[in-house]
Amino acid sequence: MLAAALLAGGAAPVGDPQRGAEIVRSRSSGLCVLCHALPGVPAVHAGTLGPDLAGVGARYSSDQLRARLVAPERFNPDTLMPSATRRDGFTRVAPGRASLPLLSAQQLEDVLSHLETLK
């Protein structure tokens, strides 16, 4: 999706870490908090299925974070984490969301921008 925008002559969206924090913590859009613990989110409201995201910005480069969001199965073939950009492979999707990726190109940049701040 981002590559298509760049090839079409569009500029890559610039991420906003504040918007990214809202998406990551949302239980209705990004959904990250359903599986991951996050700094500032009470344990009772955070998941434990995926790794804790505290310090993720120190553990991975921006490119590594992007790769993990776009193709998580490359790093763990048994992962339950969905791709943030693909439209296939989802089950039990709300009818209005069936043909949409989990995150738009702008939302992906926002989430990456936020994750990079988690040092």
Predicted regions and their residues:
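Bacterial N-terminal signal peptides
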Residues: 1-8
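Gly/Gly-Pro-rich "capping" loops immediately C-terminal to redox-active cysteine motifs
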Residues: 25, 37-71, 80-94
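Sequence context surrounding c-type heme c attachment/ligation sites in exported
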Residues: 18-21, 25-33, 46-47, 101-105
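The canonical Cys-X-X-Cys-His
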Residues: 20, 28-39, 65, 111, ...
